[in-house]
């Protein structure tokens, strides 16, 4: 079996999503509620030692916030004040593993940038707590 990977979606003529790949972008239940253009994400770069003006660093901070949201990690209160109001609860590790385990995940993020799909791939295919 091949290792699941992240696939960048494309609007290029003739591009077709691979069979069985799951789209995990923002409008889906798997989407990252922390957009990289949000001021709170830029502020989150500071304690991480990243540059809040750099798109790559902002992508890393957004993915880190997503990981903490999914795994119950803490978000600094000052940063939380700048983040979008999130409705609903994150998917559980069990749901992530059940629905995404072993599957390729698609998002619009460039493959050379950090992405929440990388977080989902790691959690979905982690042996910990697997049923």
Language-model-detected regions and their locations in the chain:
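Catalytic phosphate/metal-binding cores of nucleic-acid and nucleotide-processing enzymes, i.e., regions
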Residues: 1-131
